[in-house]
Amino acid sequence: MVQAGGDMYVAGRRGDRMWRLGIQNPRGPADSIFASLELSDATFSTSGDYERFFIKDGRRYHHIIDPDLGEPARGCRSVTIVSDRAIEADGLSTGVFVLGPAKGMALIEQLPQVEGVIVTAENQVLVSSGLKDRLTIISAPTDSRP
């Protein structure tokens, strides 16, 4: 297991089972997770609006910019991508975040060897078809912090 920032690579298995990784609750208490994911020989990358941000006049400003609007992308709170290539997972987590939930999930479903989990701005959890059997929702994402 190798971790760098929001990216992680897991090789092989943990004994006789896959590695179990948590997906952070974007508005939950620090270090809380809302779901766990079982993976083996894969890269896991998450982009979100909850790490680097500030709030001004009640509006959240974060580091993932929508190039069409010139301001922070607003449709997602977090995007987790699973792929066999780290550079692909990292780029796609940010790109899907900017595309938004519907277009982002459509892209994920079209790409081979790519799966994803999206938490929308309304805390809806979208899961790609290839992860449905490997993802466990522990609790619904919450709004317990700004």
Regions from the PLM with identified roles:
Residues 1-146:
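Mature catalytic core of soluble alpha/beta enzymes
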